[in-house]
Amino acid sequence: MMRKSHPLMKIVNHAFIDLPTPPNISGWWNFGSLLGLCLILQISTGLFLAMHYTSDTLTAFSSVAHICRDVNYGWLIRYMHANGASLFFICLYIHIGRGIYYGSYLYKETWNIGILLLFLTMATAFMGYVLPWGQMSFWGATVITNLLSAIPYIGPDLVEWIWGGFSVDKATLTRFFALHFILPFIITALVLVHLLFLHETGSNNPLGIPSDCGKVPFHPYYTTKDFLGVIMILMLFLTTVLFLPDKLGDPDNYTPANPLNTPPHIXPEWYFLFAYAILRSIPNKLGGVLALVSSILVLALLPYLHTSKQRSLSFRPLSQTLFWMLVSDLILLTWIGGQPVEPPFIIIGQLASIMYFTIILLLMPVAGLIENKMLKW
């Protein structure tokens, strides 16, 4: 068979066709392939947008308007790209949540590359948000890059180096466009490494136990199952793009960037609001930045905080309760991130931030130990 002998086809065959897969993985395992779909979608639409976009402060805003008004189906490509980012992060957060729930983080290499992918995706999305050069683009870039000035000693110099001047200006926009274009390809390369390490161990499953004795080939079982997920997610996506394209955006970004006029509420896109809320909950600049970075980096500690003798949460009611508390807490933080900095939102944000770290670092490891005791293992 050619797919088993041809050097290139052999790699594809081992990854997507004859790959031994657990027979019982649920719909939560669909999000890996959906993330691949999102990445392809973003690179394709982004490429066509880059053909018409100009990364100059004087013309960037107008070039985006030109894409929407004058380019054939430019409005569709632009809104697919903008909402594609939201879809990407929805799939990303569900994918990470699945990994936490079923103990997939015990595949350390795969998990750590996943965290690196999350950081790179967040950086790419942030820089992409700056490109239309609207009010929120400009002020978002100013606020977020300014956070680096909290780094002791080198901070202020580092910020000016990133800006390419003394404020967010033409140099900043040009380099953000260059980086926004190149990063997705670096992400694609890392995705292949992510898959390489995953296929070394094989997939986890909802029971969290080895499934070597009953594995099935990926094709046709999971190609079909993934395709169903693709159809469902595309229906949701296209409904949003065609009926509610601006629902997730900020109206301020329809005003061209003006360094002399600050918007009343500077807020990032919805998918960063939870981290923004954690950042704002600490009334000290360096402390806030450390909390912000820790909120993502804490994921890297999960393999070392795993105390239970079972891998998955499927049969651990205490840890399940804590997991869903964590999900609720993140939704609460997302809401707080979009609210102004005034009572009662300040204290709610601070309590939710404390709760976030407490659940992950303290309560879940303790719950694992209690469950071990309950089972008398």
Swiss-Prot record:
Assign the protein's first listed, main location to one coarse class. mitochondrion
TM ranges: 31-51, 75-96, 111-131, 176-196, 224-244, 286-306, 318-338, 345-365
MF terms (GO), sorted A to Z: metal ion binding; ubiquinol-cytochrome-c reductase activity
Q: Which InterPro entries match?
A: Cyt_b/b6_C, Cyt_b/b6_C_sf, Cyt_b/b6_N, Cytb/b6-like_sf, Cytochrome_b, Cytochrome_b_C_euk/bac, Cytochrome_b_N_euk/bac, Di-haem_cyt_TM
- The disulfide bonds in this chain are none
Which keywords does the record carry? Electron transport, Heme, Iron, Membrane, Metal-binding, Mitochondrion, Mitochondrion inner membrane, Respiratory chain, Transmembrane, Transmembrane helix, Transport, Ubiquinone
Which residues does a ubiquinone bind?
H199
Q: Where in the cell is it found?
A: Mitochondrion inner membrane
Q: Name one GO biological process term.
A: mitochondrial electron transport, ubiquinol to cytochrome c
Manner of cofactor binding, per the entry note: Binds 2 heme b groups non-covalently.
Instruction: Give the function comment from the record.
Output: Component of the ubiquinol-cytochrome c reductase complex (complex III or cytochrome b-c1 complex) that is part of the mitochondrial respiratory chain. The b-c1 complex mediates electron transfer from ubiquinol to cytochrome c. Contributes to the generation of a proton gradient across the mitochondrial membrane that is then used for ATP synthesis.
What protein is this chain from? Cytochrome b
State the species of origin. Answer: Heterogeomys heterodus (Variable pocket gopher)
Q: Which gene encodes it?
A: MT-CYB
